Design a protein with these regions (language model features):
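Short beta->alpha junction loops
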Residues: 44-53
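Conserved beta-strand elements of the Class I
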Residues: 5-7
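Glycine- and acidic-residue-enriched helix-capping/strand-helix junction motifs
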Residues: 14-29
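Eukaryote-biased recognition of electropositive, low-complexity segments
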Residues: 174-192
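Short helix-loop-beta junction
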Residues: 26-42
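Caspase-like (clan CD) cysteine peptidase catalytic core
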Residues: 3, 53-78, 83-159, 175, ...
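Terminal peptide-recognition signature
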Residues: 10, 31, 75
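Acidic/histidine-rich, surface-exposed loop or edge segments in extracytoplasmic proteins
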Residues: 9-16, 39-40
Length: 192
């Protein structure tokens, strides 16, 4: 049987006060209202302090474990986004785009080197795991309300608001595992 499942992440405050205040957490009730009206059977939320990197990854894993072939999956992220220097040498522009969990810091320091940023390669792996579980008969829609989530609705170079500074990494600081180069989660995606 086809089940509708969702993960809703909303972050409006951060552990690090250097981040600007945003209202990602305020989006959650509106999204939940729509999902409930659409009769989603499983809805996982991850809000503010719950939305640490470990909390977000755990929520994705819980969702993935419950998914079955042909399910409909909706994933919503409202929060900060930031670019960091590419750590996997797989980005033409040399920048990774990141979701910013509650416990991620805006700038590198002696004690923080970006390990709490949720890098696009990691997000892609989490989404690929879900796609593999729901199969070709399933449907997945991902909505990202964050800076640096893409330029589909805005012109290149058009600054609206948000974080312009790039999180600078030193290659010896971080080691993330990632999927094979040139693998694209969207290559097998079906129309919603």
């Amino acid at each position: 049987a086809q089940t509708k499942r969702a993960l809703v992440i909303g972050i409006g405050k951060q552990e690090d006060s250097a981040w600007n205040k945003i209202n990602g957490d305020k989006d959650v009730p509106y999204v939940l209202e729509i999902l409930n009206a659409a009769k989603y059977g499983q809805i996982i939320t991850c809000i503010n302090e719950e939305a640490t990197k470990a909390g977000i990854v755990s929520a994705f894993q819980t969702l993935t474990q419950s998914c079955q072939p042909n399910d409909i999956v909706y994933i919503h992220y409202s929060g900060h986004g930031q670019q960091m220097r590419d750590i996997g040498n797989d980005e033409a522009d040399t920048l990774d785009e990141c979701w910013i969990p509650y416990d991620a810091y805006r700038k590198p320091s002696d004690t923080y080197r970006g390990e709490k940023h949720l890098v696009d390669d990691e997000v892609n792996m989490l989404l690929t795991d879900i796609r593999n579980k729901i199969g070709s008969g399933g449907k997945m829609l991902v909505v990202v309300d964050a800076c640096h989530s893409g330029d589909a609705t805005r012109g290149q170079g058009e600054t609206v608001r948000g974080v312009e500074d790039i999180f600078e990494t030193v290659k010896s600081w971080l080691g993330f595992s990632s999927i094979e180069p040139n693998t694209n989660i969207h290559s097998n995606a079906e129309r919603w």
